[in-house]
Amino acid sequence: MTREELIQKIKDGEIISKVDLTGMDLSGANLSGGIFEEVRFQGANLRGADLRESIFTKPEFSGADLSSVNMRSTVMTEANLAGVSLKNACMIEAKLTDADLSGADLSGADLSTAALISATMKEANLSNTNLDHTVMHEAQLQGINLSGANLAQTVMIDAALEGAVFTGAKFHLTMMLNVNLSGMDLSGMQFTGVQFKGADLSGVNLTGADLTQASFMEANLSEAVLDQVKAQYAIFMQAKMTNASLKGAFLKQTTFGEADLTGADLSGSELESSVFEKSVCKATRFTGANMTYCDFSHADLSGADMSRARLFRTKLHRIKEEYTRWDAAGKKTALGTDPERAEAEDWKPQV
């Protein structure tokens, strides 16, 4: 089949099925709206081709050049795009399911509002890509290069991100649910409004990062370093933060309800109006921290070090304080157990 015959068949609405187009020059060709079933494009030149709103089922693109291709609203199922060039491609609203993009070059591509479902993108280059509102569900993203990428409102669910590169990437209102970022160096980065619910961030370095309004609900932050972070209004509810370091962090009006902070270090942190209700703070260090107006109701502070902490109007309702250190902490300015609240909590209906 020649290039001209292919273009004409697509214009006529014919389904292109099990055709071998290996090595064909289709650069700049208008293939928009085409339906391709198990077509081989190995080594083909598709540079700048128009594939808008086309449908591909099990296509073979190995060795093909798809740079600057227009794939807006294109649908691909089980596509082999491993190692191909998709540099500067337009993939807005494209949907790729079970695609193999391992080692592919998508640098500079626009994938805004695209969906990558169960895609394999190991070692792929997505530097400087636009991933605004892009969905990546159950994607294999190990070793992916996302440096300089725009990840504003990107959705990543159950994605494997071990070894990913985020240098200069822009995160804002991004959803990173149940992702694995353990051990990564994310120091100094901006994650404003990002949701890390259920994420594995154990051992991660977030020193100096901006976590304003970020959510780490049910996340694993054990052994993580969050020194000097800005995390006002952040949420750490039910997070595992054992032995984490948050020294000198700005955590004003942050929520730690039911979090496990055993062995964590929050020395010198700004914690005014933060909530630690029902949190576990065994052997946690709050030395010199500002905990004015904090709420530690029902918290376990056994063995915690509250030395020199500011506790003005801090709620200490029914805390556990065995072996807790209060040296020069101004505990007298705090609020102890509220008898009326305690009575209400203990009330049981008569049988």
Over which residues does each language-model region extend?
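Tandem repeat scaffolds
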Residues: M1-V351
